[in-house]
C-alpha cells in the first residue's frame, strides 16, 4: 500500500492514539469514583425501597429546666407555700390565670418564679372571685366591662320585647278570612 494513501485514510478516519484513550479512561474512572463517594445514599436504593429517614434532633425542655433550676439555686430562692392562684393582668383586659402554681421567691434579688400551666382568660370569666385582686388600672377596665355588659342587657331586653310581640296571635281584620288562604 502506498504511504500517501495510508496517510489520507488515517486523516479521514482519525484513529486515536493510545495516550488519548488512556486520558479518556482516567476521566471516566475518576468520575465514577467521585459519584460513588458522594452519592452513597442514593445508589443502594432502587424502585420500591422506602425513603431515607431523616434523623430529627429534638431539643428537650428538660435541659432548659435544669439550667433554670441551677440559676435559681444560685440566687437562693425559697418556695412559697399555700398559694392557690396567680392572675396576671394584661393591657388588653385579658388575664393569664395560673391555678395552684408552684412559686419560688428571692426577696433580696426581687425575683419570683412561677411554675404551672397558664390559661389566658377574659376578665368576665373570673369576675366574682377576682374583685379583691384588682388594682386601679384594672378597675378602669372593669368599669368599661360593666358598661358594655349593661348595654348588652339593654339590647337583649329590647329584642325580648320584640320577640314577645311576634309570638302573639295577629289581630283579625273584619271581612278577611285567613283560612281560605291556607288551603
Curated annotation (Swiss-Prot):
Coiled coil: none annotated. Residues 62-127 form the NAC-A/B domain. Keywords: Cytoplasm, Nucleus, Protein transport, Repressor, Transcription, Transcription regulation, Transport. Residues 150-183 are annotated as: Disordered. One of its GO terms (cellular component) is nascent polypeptide-associated complex. Residues 164-183 have a biased composition (Acidic residues). The keyword Protease does not apply. GO terms for biological process: protein transport. The keyword Transcription applies. It is found in: Cytoplasm; Nucleus. Signal peptide: none annotated. Belongs to the NAC-beta family. Component of the nascent polypeptide-associated complex (NAC), a dynamic component of the ribosomal exit tunnel, protecting the emerging polypeptides from interaction with other cytoplasmic proteins to ensure appropriate nascent protein targeting. The NAC complex also promotes mitochondrial protein import by enhancing productive ribosome interactions with the outer mitochondrial membrane and blocks the inappropriate interaction of ribosomes translating non-secretory nascent polypeptides with translocation sites in the membrane of the endoplasmic reticulum. This is Nascent polypeptide-associated complex subunit beta. It comes from Neosartorya fischeri (strain ATCC 1020 / DSM 3700 / CBS 544.65 / FGSC A1164 / JCM 1740 / NRRL 181 / WB 181).
Amino acid at each position: 500500500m502506498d504511504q500517501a494513501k495510508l496517510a489520507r485514510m488515517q486523516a479521514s478516519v482519525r484513529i486515536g492514539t493510545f495516550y488519548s484513550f488512556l486520558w479518556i479512561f482516567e476521566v471516566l474512572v475518576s468520575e465514577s469514583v467521585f459519584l460513588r463517594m458522594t452519592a452513597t445514599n442514593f445508589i443502594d436504593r432502587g424502585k420500591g425501597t422506602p425513603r431515607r429517614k431523616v434523623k430529627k434532633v429534638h431539643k428537650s425542655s428538660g435541659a432548659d429546666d435544669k439550667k433554670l433550676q441551677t440559676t435559681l439555686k444560685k440566687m437562693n430562692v425559697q418556695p412559697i407555700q399555700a398559694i392557690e392562684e396567680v392572675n396576671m393582668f394584661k393591657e388588653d383586659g385579658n388575664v393569664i390565670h395560673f391555678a395552684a402554681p408552684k412559686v419560688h421567691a428571692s426577696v433580696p434579688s426581687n425575683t419570683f418564679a412561677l411554675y404551672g400551666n397558664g390559661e389566658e382568660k377574659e376578665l368576665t370569666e373570673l369576675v366574682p372571685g377576682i374583685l379583691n385582686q384588682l388594682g386601679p388600672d384594672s378597675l378602669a377596665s372593669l368599669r368599661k366591662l360593666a358598661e358594655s355588659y349593661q348595654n348588652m342587657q339593654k339590647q337583649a331586653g329590647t329584642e325580648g320585647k320584640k320577640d314577645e310581640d311576634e309570638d302573639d296571635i295577629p289581630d283579625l281584620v273584619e271581612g278577611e278570612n285567613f283560612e281560605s288562604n291556607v288551603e
